[in-house]
């Protein structure tokens, strides 16, 4: 299973840790799972970590002096340390566990945005943002009188950085940018955006849902004020996301939810708050999920994030080349050697939903629709697209199966 940091991945050994990949679907077809941008699969060591928690030391955290509670509390706190270090943070005080990236976005928008924004302030997003960013900041803007602006994309799917430099001004309070587009695969220069934002006294929130699972991330090198990602896209369980925040910002922010464990002292008149990250984790937290996500980080780091990135880049470039050479196929976004592990496309005369249904008949699982980026699809001039996305356990043979199934669909719909 393991590889050196720069060495190739032993894909067959990796696949052995994922029994689901041995499934047959659609009446006997081998499963070709290419929907990793939506969710990844979970390896046996991570499943074992969840089972071990429930079998051996299931208990609430920060609430008991008995041995089980102490064991669970230590494991849960250590998971914060591990996830903080995974993205280049310094310690657990900078790592809040949420239920997903969307909740992390909402936490910042409502704990920081509602208290800090007002008329005359601007929040600058990109045209390729996920609905979790778009809708959230639109709602905060409606409540505060702030204005939301959007950095346009170029014809080849990159961010227009000249426009970004013009749009980010002293009126900008926050820049929200996706690190890797879940539709175009564009890898955005978030470090450059952070520099521009900070030059104008603004903060930057980076949506790392597609980046953190697939490449080494260093929030200090980026100089991100906030960086969010989800466990289920990086071999972890569902129900857990992560929000990195600079320590001083989290310390200054008001809580997002209220209840147990996020308090320091409560009286009948008022309350004071616990320190970060606990003041943002009200109630019984995501204990099993946090412990399992730490195990997923171990799994990824044993293989090596550089090795994972190299494997995905090779697969993505191959898929891009094969699809662009296929008649009647339009591929969106940057060239194949300049993108994350996502390829969105359409086949002339076939709606993306119909294409996905036909591909399923051949065992190929992709996503079809707007991928929670309706405004971006409006910009592209299409109502929907098909999306193939790759991860560490995918192979060139699976890309070939995708392309062959697309060609079969073309034949079915041929006039």
UniProtKB/Swiss-Prot annotation:
**Catalytic residues, chain numbering:** 372 (cysteine persulfide intermediate)
The N6-(pyridoxal phosphate)lysine modification is found at 233
Which UniProt keywords are present, listed alphabetically? Pyridoxal phosphate, Transferase
What InterPro entries would the database entry show? Answer: Aminotrans_V_dom, Cys_dSase_SufS, PyrdxlP-dep_Trfase, PyrdxlP-dep_Trfase_major, PyrdxlP-dep_Trfase_small
Cofactor(s), names only, from the UniProt record? pyridoxal 5'-phosphate
Q: Which GO terms describe its biological process?
A: cysteine metabolic process
EC number(s) for this protein?
Answer: 2.8.1.7
Q: Which reaction does it catalyse?
A: (sulfur carrier)-H + L-cysteine = (sulfur carrier)-SH + L-alanine
Which cysteines bridge via disulfide bonds?
none
Gene3D superfamilies per the UniProt record, alphabetical: Aspartate Aminotransferase, domain 1, Type I PLP-dependent aspartate aminotransferase-like (Major domain)
- Which EC class heads this enzyme's classification? transferase
Q: Which GO terms describe its molecular function?
A: cysteine desulfurase activity; pyridoxal phosphate binding
Similarity comment: Belongs to the class-V pyridoxal-phosphate-dependent aminotransferase family. Csd subfamily.
PANTHER family documented for this protein: CYSTEINE DESULFURASE, CYSTEINE DESULFURASE 1, CHLOROPLASTIC
Q: What is this protein called?
A: Probable cysteine desulfurase
Q: Which organism is it from?
A: Halobacterium salinarum (strain ATCC 700922 / JCM 11081 / NRC-1) (Halobacterium halobium)
Q: Lineage of the source organism?
A: Archaea, Methanobacteriati, Methanobacteriota, Stenosarchaea group, Halobacteria
**Gene name of the record:** csd
């Amino acid at each position: 299973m393991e590889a050196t940091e720069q060495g190739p991945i032993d894909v067959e050994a990796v696949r052995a840790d994922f029994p689901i990949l041995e499934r047959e679907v659609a009446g006997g077809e081998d499963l070709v799972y290419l929907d990793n941008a939506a969710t990844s699969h979970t390896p046996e060591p991570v499943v074992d970590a969840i089972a071990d928690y429930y079998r051996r030391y299931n208990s609430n955290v920060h609430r008991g002096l008995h041995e089980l509670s102490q064991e669970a509390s230590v494991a849960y706190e250590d998971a914060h340390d591990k996830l903080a270090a995974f993205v280049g943070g310094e310690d657990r005080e900078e790592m809040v566990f949420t239920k997903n990236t969307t909740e992390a976005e909402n936490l910042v928008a409502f704990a920081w945005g509602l208290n800090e924004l007002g008329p005359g302030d601007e929040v600058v997003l990109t045209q390729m943002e996920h609905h979790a960013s778009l809708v959230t900041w639109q709602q905060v803007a409606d409540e505060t009188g702030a204005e939301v602006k959007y950095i346009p994309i170029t014809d080849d799917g990159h961010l227009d950085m000249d426009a970004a430099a013009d749009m980010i001004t002293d009126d900008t309070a926050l820049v929200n940018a996706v690190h890797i587009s879940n539709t175009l695969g564009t890898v955005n220069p978030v470090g450059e955006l952070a520099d521009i934002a900070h030059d104008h006294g603004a903060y930057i929130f980076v949506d790392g849902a597609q980046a953190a699972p697939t490449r080494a991330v260093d929030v200090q090198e980026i100089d991100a004020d906030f960086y969010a990602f989800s466990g289920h896209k990086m071999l972890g369980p569902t129900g857990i996301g992560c929000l990195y925040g600079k320590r001083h910002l989290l310390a200054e922010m008001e809580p997002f939810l209220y209840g147990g464990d996020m308090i320091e002292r409560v009286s009948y008149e008022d309350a004071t708050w616990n320190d970060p990250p606990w003041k943002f984790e009200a109630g019984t937290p995501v204990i099993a999920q946090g412990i399992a996500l730490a195990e997923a980080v171990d799994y990824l780091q044993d293989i090596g994030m550089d090795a994972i990135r190299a494997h995905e880049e090779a697969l993505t470039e191959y898929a891009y080349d094969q699809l662009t050479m296929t008649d009647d196929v339009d591929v969106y976004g940057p060239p194949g050697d300049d993108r994350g592990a996502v390829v969105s496309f359409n086949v002339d005369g076939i709606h993306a939903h119909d294409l996905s249904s036909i591909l399923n008949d051949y065992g190929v699982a992709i996503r079809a629709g707007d991928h929670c980026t309706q405004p971006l699809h409006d910009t592209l001039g299409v109502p929907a697209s098909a999306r193939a996305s790759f991860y560490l356990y995918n192979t060139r043979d699976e890309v070939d199966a995708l392309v062959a199934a697309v060609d079969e669909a073309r034949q079915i719909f041929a006039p």
